Amino acid sequence: MSMYDVLIIGAGPGGIFTAYELIERRPDLKIAIFEHGHELSRRKCPIDGEKIKSCIHCNCCSIMSGFGGAGAFSDGKYNITNDFGGTLYEYIGKKNAIELMEYVDKINLKFGGEGTKLYSTAGTKFKKTCMQHGLHLLD
């Protein structure tokens, strides 16, 4: 039987970053990550919009469970701001919250995000239309 120093339950962002931080600080640790969900290549949601139009409550949800959690199917955009999207700053202060967001962004870039095209709505008709309807967009 294999012995591990650390067992991490869940391979969502929290579990993945926990493993990363532990390895950075203690490369000697033997770490195992346990995940309920399917591997990425087997994560398929049965909702097709025709026969199945809404959630059928699968035993293991392929959207929420599996490596990367729900973020595995996102477009990968991060909002590096305290203006919306969460309230971490209420616990650690605005400056520290931004520093942590930038730290996470640097790690993501290190593992394949470098060359990602930046997207901005600044000065666009889309942004103007959104603002007219009370929607706030990050530039």
Label each residue range with its predicted role:
Residues T18-L22:
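Aromatic pocket-lining residues of Rossmann-like dinucleotide-binding sites
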Residues P13-I16, E39:
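Generic N-terminal leader segments that precede the first folded domain
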Residues E39-R43, I47-D139:
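Conserved N-terminal/central alpha/beta ligand/cofactor-binding core
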Residues S2-G14, A32-F34:
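Beta1/beta-strand and adjacent pyrophosphate-binding region of the FAD-binding site
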Residues Y4, D28-K30, L138:
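Nucleotide donor/acceptor-binding cores
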Residues D28-E35, L40:
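Short beta-strand "acidic-cap" motif of Rossmann-like dinucleotide-binding folds
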